[in-house]
Amino acid sequence: MMNTGAIIQDLIDWIDNHLDSRLDIDTVARRAGYSKWHLQRIFKEHTGQPLGEYIRAQKLQKSIERLAHSNEPILNVAIALGFDSQQSFNRSFKRQYGQAPGVW
């Protein structure tokens, strides 16, 4: 049986490989086989970061790569990475990086 640290690392790898999917805490918890409450607790214990924050940060990092290396419209990037709207993407992006995604 895998220890909790190995399970979390496996989950991080899975998340990082599925950033183009609609990822939410419920989906990740089902994948891990834990309740979402338990998963959030052990994820934070092992990484120091809340699970939702980790997913959002990884998606935003991927959005920078896509925006910097293509002419893809911001809306397309936002939707492809699972944001509900360009507005919600813009808010998250600005909160994370202090500037609008159009700068990239």
Regions found by a protein language model. Name each.
Residues M1-A6, D13, P50, R91-W104:
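…primarily DNA-binding HTH/wHTH and HhH modules…
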Residues N3, I7, D24, R31:
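Conserved acidic
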Residues Q9-D26, E45-L81:
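Terminal helix-turn-helix DNA-binding modules in bacterial transcription factors
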Residues T27-K36, Q40:
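Helix-turn-helix
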Residues Y34, F83-D84:
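The short coil/loop that forms the "turn" connecting the two helices of the helix-turn-helix
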Residues W37, Q86-Q87, G102:
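Key DNA-contact positions within bacterial/archaeal DNA-binding proteins
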